[in-house]
Amino acid sequence: MAGLSIWHVVIFAIVVILLFGTSKLKNIGKDVGGAVRDFKKSVREEDEAASLNSPRTIDAQAKTSESTSVKS
């Protein structure tokens, strides 16, 4: 059987905890979370910078006012 049962996952988790310890796993989790947060922040900043630099078109009718008299 190629699938993982719940017992495989439980045994794997116990082995990982025994090897690394809970404090080490917590630090690894913090580091991975910080890396993901920084990556999302940089992607968001690039998207905002790209949207500010992209050319924009304005769809509007030009209005002209004609004045025939000139005041001096």
Swiss-Prot record:
A GO CC annotation given for this chain: TAT protein transport complex
Organism phylogeny: Bacteria, Pseudomonadati, Pseudomonadota, Gammaproteobacteria, Moraxellales
Biased composition (Polar residues): 51-72
Transmembrane segments: 1-21
Protein name, UniProt field: Sec-independent protein translocase protein TatA
Family to which this protein belongs: Belongs to the TatA/E family.
Compartment(s) where it occurs, according to its Swiss-Prot or TrEMBL record: Cell inner membrane
Domain of life: Bacteria
Keyword Cell inner membrane assigned: yes
Subunit structure: The Tat system comprises two distinct complexes: a TatABC complex, containing multiple copies of TatA, TatB and TatC subunits, and a separate TatA complex, containing only TatA subunits. Substrates initially bind to the TatABC complex, which probably triggers association of the separate TatA complex to form the active translocon.
Pfam family, one: TatA_B_E
